Amino acid sequence: MRHTTLLSGIICLLCLLAACGDSHFMTDASYRSRVERDFQQKKTLMPQGDLFAIFDTSLSDYEREALEFLYAYMPLADIADYSGEFHLMNVRASRQAADEMPWGKRIPEDIFRHFVLPVRVNNEHLDSARVVFYKELKDRVKTLSLQDAILEVNHWCHEKAIYTPS
């Protein structure tokens, strides 16, 4: 009887852990399908080389979907000029910030997808500044509200650079 109860408990625990496993980057299945379709179209535009080799590596569902989103909508030059590992590093860095900051889980999925995950907004050079800035800022903002964290980042920026008109 004790063994049956123990075995049942282990099975329940395994089922629970399996259910709590990897999460989706995009929870809306229809939107996820649209991104997948757009990603496949992008792949057909660039069939030569190993530009999409990162997708042949071991990725979580979240990482795969986030990368597919980025690749589907990023400029072709960013796919050709930057490695998949670079883009994966940025996916992981953005998720780390969302997971570690107290307000990170409250950022709406579409806002995160379009304004946090992308490595750039316009045509600036891509680099690993996101990782460097996070290391420098996380302890300054981790106990603050989202609004106060935004203000603190502005203060930090003022400490680092001063605008001088040209």
Which residue ranges define each predicted feature?
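Residue-level detector of intrinsically disordered, flexible termini
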Residues: 17-18, 148
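Bacterial N-terminal signal peptides
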Residues: 8-17
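Short intrinsically disordered, low-complexity coil segments enriched in acidic
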Residues: 2-3, 19, 163
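Secondary-structure boundary elements
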Residues: 80, 84-166
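Intrinsically disordered, low-complexity N-terminal segments that are enriched in acidic
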Residues: 20-98
